[in-house]
Structures are given as structure tokens and as C-alpha cells.
């Protein structure tokens, strides 16, 4: 199993950071609805509650081409815990390297009005041979891409800097 953590400081209150990461669905939005982002897409199958708990999605994202999947992967994900302006936790199953990921982002508003966002994810390939051969490199690519996506998105809330 591999894990990855990143902490960002965002020059915005937690409420604004949350709004950027969890925009409400438009009233007339069909289900499923698709959101495009740099390097992939997310298809929302169920919106979940007002905090996003229960949200069900599939994601398409990049993986190393040597996995012979055309450089793309797909995950099936559910948000298992969510607290508005605080926390979103998910579980995912993905392919082509059949794996399970669990992760969260947590917001911690600071006294100076900035917000610390902590992103953490664990990744585990089920097949022991594929795990030994590919898990570390695949998770490294996914983690690097997630960092870029977070940095890109968080800039819509305010100036952003990765601090760990």
C-alpha cells in the first residue's frame, strides 16, 4: 500500500475553498452530469446530500501508458463522509490496475483568514504481482496529477501555496 499527503495554504476562508471544490449542481442539471478538468473527467451519478455525502461518481484520469490502457484509467467512487466547509472522504475502486483508494480532503480555517487544506490518499493494488511491479509508480503519477489538479482548482478561491 502506498500513501500520499499534501497540504496547501489558501488565501481564502474555508467556506470559499469548499465552494470551489464542491460547487452546487445547477438546478436543471441532468443526471448523470459530466465535469471536465485538466487531465480527466468526472461523471456524477448521484449528488449525495447537501454536503456531498453519498455522492457517487466515476472518474477518468491519466495513468502510465505501459499499463496498456491507452494512458487512461477509470474509477468508481463514493463519498462516504462529508461535512460542509470541513471534510470530504471517499473510497474508490479503479482499473486497469485493479486497486482500492481511500482519501479525503480536510479544511482547517486559520485565525488569519487563510485555510489549510490537507489532501491524503492511500492506494492498494489487489494483485500481488501487479502490486510489486506497478503500484508505486502508478500511485506516484496519480498523486502528482492530483497535486496539479488541487493547485489549479484552489487558485479560484485565492492565492495558493503547497506547504508540504
Q: Where do the model's predicted regions map?
A:
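Hydrophobic ligand-binding cavity/cleft-lining segments
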Residues: 1-50
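Intrinsic-disorder/low-complexity, polar/charged segments enriched in Ser/Thr/Lys/Arg/Asp/Glu/Gln
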Residues: 1-9, 56, 74, 87, ...
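Hydrophobic/aromatic beta-strand elements that line small-molecule binding cavities or substrate pockets
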Residues: 6-8, 74-81, 92-94, 102-109, ...
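Beta-strand elements of well-folded, non-transmembrane domains
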Residues: 10-12, 63-65, 96, 107, ...
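A short, structured loop/turn motif at beta-sheet edges
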Residues: 11-15, 80-87, 106-118, 161
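Glycine-rich portal/gate segments that line the openings of hydrophobic small-molecule binding cavities
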Residues: 28, 39-96, 148-164
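Amphipathic hydrophobic-ligand
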Residues: 97-102, 143
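A conserved amphipathic terminal alpha-helix motif
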Residues: 116, 122-164
